[in-house]
Amino acid sequence: MLTNAAFNDFRNMIKRMIARAQYRVGSTWYDSTLLETVITGDNIVRVKTQIAHGSPCTINRVRLISSNGDVWAEKAINVILENSYTHLLQWFDFNIAESEVN
């Protein structure tokens, strides 16, 4: 079974490897602002990104890109940004867990 040190190493590796975030409008990907990557009190790695498109649009996906340029996480959303919205906050939570298989 993994030790607490191993779990901490996995969490910190995720923190180090997430390099940027993107969102998609239609079929076009745009970079968004990566606000923070933290380990919460519940030992969840939380990655927050802020989307500011500048004009009304419908955002249909968000994703996280590793420092190697690989997509590490992606999720479908359906958020309409109107003129009254300045930005959209999205986050990904990663819970590292172990289970024993008999």
Place the predicted regions along the sequence by residue.
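Small cysteine-rich, disulfide-bonded extracellular modules of the LU/uPAR three-finger superfamily
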Residues: 1-63, 67-102
